[in-house]
């Protein structure tokens, strides 16, 4: 399993980007979450079954939705012992 954390910057808050991300993740049967950060970025934690699944998700993120403008995606691989387990993918408020 691949566990990744993303920090997305650009025009990503107030434009439906979290909902867009949740839709993609749920369509791909991913687990994790998406949430807005106080500094204007969006944080995503996602668990993938395959590298191909991860690459597809990242490609869709880079394109964003029609209202967003993605300037940068910072990616971090999470430790195998990442403490949270998820049953689905959801938006944290």
Curated annotation (Swiss-Prot):
Domain of life: Bacteria
Record flagged with keyword Hydrolase: yes
GO molecular function, one term: acylphosphatase activity
Ranges for domain Acylphosphatase-like: 3-93
Record bears the keyword RNA-binding: no
Reaction(s) catalysed (UniProt annotation): an acyl phosphate + H2O = a carboxylate + phosphate + H(+)
EC identifiers of the protein: 3.6.1.7
Cited NCBIfam families: PRK14432.1
Keywords annotated in UniProt: Hydrolase, Plasmid
Family statement drawn from the similarity comment of this UniProt entry: Belongs to the acylphosphatase family.
SUPFAM superfamilies associated with the record: Acylphosphatase/BLUF domain-like (SSF54975)
Alphabetized InterPro entries for the sequence: Acylphosphatase, Acylphosphatase-like_dom, Acylphosphatase-like_dom_sf, Acylphosphatase_CS
Active site: 18, 36
Protein name: Acylphosphatase
